[in-house]
Amino acid sequence: MNIVIGKIRLQYRIVFLMIIWIAMLVLSLSFLAILQLTFQNDPQGETISSESWAGYIVSRDANAYIQVNAINGSWTVPSVSTTAGDEHSSIWVGVGGQLDDTLIQAGTEQDASGGKEFYYSWYELIPAYAVRVNTIMVSPGDVMVASLRLVDPAVNRWNIQISDSTTGQYFGTTVSYNSTGSSGEWILERPTVSNNISTLADFGNVTFAGCHLSADSKTGPIKAFYFSRIAMTNSVNTQLASVSNIATNGADFTVKYVSTK
C-alpha cells in the first residue's frame, strides 16, 4: 500500500515539475518575442559618437543598405547667445556623408561672432562650399522646412527646397550632383571653419519635426527605418549636445546644448 502511494506521489511531482517547466519556457519565449518586437519597432540603442554632428541618421533597412532619394524635416530657428568670440551652429537635412564623401545638404546657420548674431539659410554640395540663400531673411523663432529630392536619377538631378513658414519666403533650385544616396540625416552641427571644427554656439535647444525620407520604394518617418542616434562629443569624449529619443509619432526629436567645447 505504501509503495503504491509513493509511486502516485512521484507521478504527481513529475507532472507538476513538467507543468512548471513548460510555463517557464512559454514565458521565456514570450519575453524574447517582446524584446525582438521592441527592437524592430524602436531600435534606439545604437549610438554613434561624432565631434561635429548631433541628431539621427538612417543608413540601412534591416540588414540591407538603402538608397535615399528624398528627405525632409522642419525646425524652429533657435536664438544663439552672443559672445565676443566666434561660435557656430548649423541645422540641416542631408543625403549621404556617412559611408562615403558625397553629401548634399540644406539648412540654416546660427552663429555668434564679435558680439553679434548671424542667421541665414544655405545649401551645400560637398566638396563645394556652401551657397548662402539671400532671398530668405532668417530670424530666431522662424519655422523652417527643408527638403531634398532626386527628380531625375538618369542624370543625377536633385531638387532643393527651403521655406520659411513664418514669413512665407521660399527658395528652390535644381542641381546636378552625383550622390550615392547611402544615408539620410537630420543634424545639428558645429561646422568646420578654416579647416578646423568650430566652437559650438549656445543654441539652447532645437526640435526637429516631421522628419521623413524615401529610400528605394519605401517612404516614412525615421522610425520606419533602422536608425542610429548621433551624440556630439569633443576629442576627450565630453558631451557637447544631447539628443532625445524619437517621439511616438516616429518623426520628431530634440537636440539640446550642453557645452561649448
Give the residues covered by each predicted segment.
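Exposed, interaction-prone regions of secreted/extracellular proteins
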Residues: 34-261
